[in-house]
From Swiss-Prot:
Principal location: cytoplasm
Protein name: Alanyl-tRNA editing protein Aarsd1
Organism: Homo sapiens (Human)
Gene: AARSD1
Similarity comment text for this entry: Belongs to the class-II aminoacyl-tRNA synthetase family. Alax-L subfamily.
Cofactor note: Binds 1 zinc ion per subunit.
UniProt subcellular location: Cytoplasm
Entry-annotated residues carrying Phosphoserine: 174
MF annotations from Gene Ontology: alanine-tRNA ligase activity; ATP binding; metal ion binding; nucleic acid binding; Ser-tRNA(Ala) deacylase activity
Length: 412
């Protein structure tokens, strides 16, 4: 059985009757990215204008009597609509589809059929699967690689067919119809019942499909192939946008271009060269900065070594610096008799720490210092270093070390 959304992909609302409404749960992804379970109801209607997930196409969103439908799934010949409000069986309801989402899916799905057919016709490249993503779609082709010329030829051909305004129609064939054997497709679901649905692009392609499609290729507006990516099992993913997604992509790209023009103070044609120059300048500055930091670390190490306060616990904190900076100081000092506690980072945030000195003392104190600074670390051979999330507790860590030294001195 075909749902109303399949018989008329352009229908935006539909009046029907509630068949059943049962308590159900839906696993979904929350705003924090974690899985959460929603309690609600599984509503079955006599027919529906909301497409249930299938054929590589995501399900529709919409409303039933202004009640939001959060998921639509197919179960045999019926569609289950998940809502968080119950509906009375036997009642008449108005079902409305989220048209922006639906039309986007129609453009991407029909675009996939067209690209698949053209890739096969031009280069005998077979489609093994496809994915309709939130921002872009991918067609997996049974080839280890594609040339830029092949990609360009496919893009040119599909857009020519869009300009030719070729009609797209849907037919239903019985399972025993001889024509079924001549139709492309990757098979039917195990629970499929009823006639076979065939989507035909006039003179281009005829394919088994359960999805919603445009009625004419002109509704695709344009297809842009963004390129290829390496796929699984020695295959290639062809990345594409169709219809309104191309316009949105162009709008984002133009916005980025304008922003870069203002930042780089040059025309779009010079952006790449300007960024390369900035990268080269940054590398030189980073190298010079590293050399200066190393010289500073050596100077600091010698100053600490010759300080009248040398002995017990030697403490140094700097806002600027990195792990290498601290290790240079520790290497230059090279003492296993004195505890050296070095920290770098913002006192109001996180940073890095290093504890060096007598191996037994460092082994004991390292994890405790990490705990005080609410960080993590590891070490061996008289050196323990790691990341701290609370550099504001640095004074507590210093007190811990000084207490330890005082206790050790008292024992001696």
């Amino acid at each position: 059985m075909a749902f109303w959304c399949q018989r008329d992909s352009y229908a935006r609302e539909f009046t029907t009757t509630v068949v059943s409404c049962c308590p159900a749960e839906l696993q979904t992804e929350g705003s924090n990215g974690k899985k959460e379970v929603l309690s609600g109801f599984q509503v079955v209607l006599e027919d529906t204008v909301l497409f249930p997930e299938g054929g590589g196409q995501p399900d529709d969103r919409g409303t039933i009597n202004d009640i939001s439908v959060l998921r639509v799934t197919r179960r045999g010949e019926q569609a289950d609509h998940f809502t968080q409000t119950p509906l009375d069986p036997g009642s008449q309801v108005l079902v409305r589809v989220d048209w922006e989402r639906r039309f986007d899916h129609m453009q991407q799905h029909s675009g996939q059929h067209l690209i698949t057919a053209v890739a096969d016709h031009l280069f005998k490249l077979k489609t093994t699967s496809w994915e309709l993503g939130r921002f872009r779609s991918a067609i997996e082709l049974d080839t280890p690689s594609m040339t830029a010329e092949q990609v360009a030829a496919i893009e040119q051909s599909v857009n020519e067919k869009i300009r030719d305004r070729l009609p797209v129609n849907v037919r239903e064939l019985s399972l025993d119809d001889p024509e079924v054997e001549q139709v492309s497709g990757r098979g039917l679901p195990d629970d499929h019942a009823g006639p076979i649905r065939v989507v035909n692009i006039e003179g281009v392609d005829s394919n088994m499909c359960c999805g919603t499609h445009v009625s004419n290729l002109s509704d695709l507006q344009v297809i842009k192939i963004l390129g290829t990516e390496k796929g699984k099992k020695n295959r290639t993913n062809l990345i594409f946008l169709s219809g309104n997604r191309v316009l949105k992509w162009m709008e984002r790209s133009h916005g980025t271009e304008k922003a870069l023009t203002a930042l780089l103070k040059c025309g779009a044609e010079d952006h790449v060269e300007a960024v390369k120059k900035l990268q080269n300048s940054t590398k030189i500055l980073q190298k010079n900065n590293l050399n200066l930091l190393r010289d500073l670390a050596v100077h600091i190490a010698h100053s600490l070594r010759n300080s009248p306060d040398w002995g017990g616990v030697v403490i140094l904190h700097r806002k600027e610096g990195d792990s290498e900076f601290m290790n240079i100081i520790a290497n230059e000092i090279g003492s296993e008799e004195t505890l050296l506690f070095l920290t770098v980072g913002d006192e109001k945030g996180g940073g890095l720490f290093l504890l060096a000195g007598p191996p037994a003392s460092v082994e004991t104190l390292g994890p405790r210092v990490a705990e005080v600074l609410e960080g993590k670390g590891a070490g061996k051979k008289g050196r323990f270093q790691g990341k701290a999330t609370k550099m504001s507790r640095r004074m507590e860590a210093q007190a811990l070390l000084q207490d330890y030294i005082s206790t050790q001195s008292a024992k001696e």
